Amino acid sequence: MGGAVVDEGPTGVKAPDGGWGWAVLFGCFVITGFSYAFPKAVSVFFKELIQEFGIGYSDTAWISSILLAMLYGTGPLCSVCVNRFGCRPVMLVGGLFASLGMVAASFCRSIIQVYLTTGVITGLGLALNFQPSLIMLNRYFSKRRPMANGLAAAGSPVFLCALSPLGQLLQDRYGWRGGFLILGGLLLNCCVCAALMRPLVVTAQPGSGPPRPSRRLLDLSVFRDRGFVLYAVAASVMVLGLFVPPVFVVSYAKDLGVPDTKAAFLLTILGFIDIFARPAAGFVAGLGKVRPYSVYLFSFSMFFNGLADLAGSTAGDYGGLVVFCIFFGISYGMVGALQFEVLMAIVGTHKFSSAIGLVLLMEAVAVLVGPPSGGKLLDATHVYMYVFILAGAEVLTSSLILLLGNFFCIRKKPKEPQPEVAAAEEEKLHKPPADSGVDLREVEHFLKAEPEKNGEVVHTPETSV
C-alpha cells in the first residue's frame, strides 16, 4: 500500500517524466484551481443574490454545496466517460458545460434556476475536467509524480486568492449577472487546458503480443484490494471534518470580538501558507527514502491536521487563531498534495480512473454531511470550541484508520517473489530438457496443421482473438 507503482500507463508507454508533461502539469494546475476555488469564489455574489431573489443566506449557500456535490458525486460517471472516450474529449465537453452553466445563470429569474445552472451544469463541467486532468498527470509522471501532484494541487489556493477579489471586482462594476457572464467566459479556458492533454500513444512493434482486451468502463475490482478499501474509508471519514474549520474560522473570530476585516484576513493567511505547503509536501514525498512510505506520511499529515483543529478549539484571541491558521494551512496543504499520490501508489495507473471516481463518490456524502453537522452542533451549543473538537476528532480517527490498517492488514501480506527470481524460475520451467531431442519446428508445424481435435478448437496465436 505504501509502495510506489512504476507508471507505464494503460498503453504500456513509460511515463516521460517531463517534456510535454510540463504542459499537462500546467493544465492540471489550472483545472484544479477552478474546480476547488470556484465553489468558494462564487460566495462573493451571495449578498446580491439574497437581495435579488428575497431569500436567506442558507438558500444561497446551497449553490456552493451543489457545486461540490457534483464535483465529488459524479466521480463514477467521469470514470465511465474517460474509459469510454478518453480524457481529452471528456474535458473539452466539460469545459463547454462549465462555461454554459455560468452564462445561463446570468439570465436566471429564480434561485432554483441558479441551482440548476451554476450548481448542476457548471458543477458537472468542472467534474468532467478535474478527474481526467489528474489521470493524465499521473500518466505523464512516474518518478516525479509526487512533486507533480503537489504543484498541481497548489492551483487550489492560488486560484482562490485570485478569483475571490476578481469576483468582488466584477460584482461592483457589472453586478452579479455581468459577473456570472464574464466568469462563464473565463471557464472556457478549461477547453484550452483540455487541448494540452495529449494522449500517450504506443507505436506497434513487430513481434508484439496481441492487443490488450478493452478495460471495463467502471472497474469495481478495486474493492478487492484491501489497501484501496482502507484508503476509501479513511478518506471519507477525513472529509467529514477536513473542510469544517475553514468554514467556521471567520465566524469564530467575529464571535471573539475581532473586526470583520481582520477576521476575513485569517483565510488569506491560511491560503498563503497552503500555496507553499503543497509543493513542499510533494517534493518531500518524492524523495527516494520517503516515497515507499508515502502512506505513512499521508497518515501523519491527517494526524497533524486533527491536532491543529484540537489546538484551534482552545484559541481565545486573534493571535491564537492566526497560529491555528498557520499550522492548519501546513497540514491542509500536505493532505491536498498527498491524497491522490497515495491513491495512485495503491491502485496503479490502470485502475486509477475507476478508483478516483469511486473515492470521490464516497467523499461526496461526507462533504454534504460534514459542514452542516458542524452547523447543527453550533446551533445547539453556541460554542465554537465543540465544532473544532468534533472536526479534529474525525480527522484524527481517519489517520488512525489508515495508519493501523496499513500496519496490521497490509504489511502482513505474504511477500511476493522477487522479479528476477520469478523470471528465472519461469524460464527454467519452459526450457526443454537438453536430451529431449524434440524438434521445436515440428511441434509448431503440428499445432498449425491440426486446429481441431475431437471436435474441440485449439486456439493458437493465429486463431485467438
UniProtKB/Swiss-Prot annotation:
Keyword Transmembrane helix tagged: yes
Listed name of the protein: Monocarboxylate transporter 4
GO molecular function ontology, one term from the record: RNA binding
Side of membrane Cytoplasmic, spans: 2-17, 83-84, 131-149, 201-227, 286-294, 339-351, 406-465
Organism whose genome encodes this protein: Homo sapiens
Record's function text: Proton-dependent transporter of monocarboxylates such as L-lactate and pyruvate. Plays a predominant role in L-lactate efflux from highly glycolytic cells.
Superkingdom, taxonomy of origin: Eukaryota
Residue ranges, annotated region (Disordered): 419-438
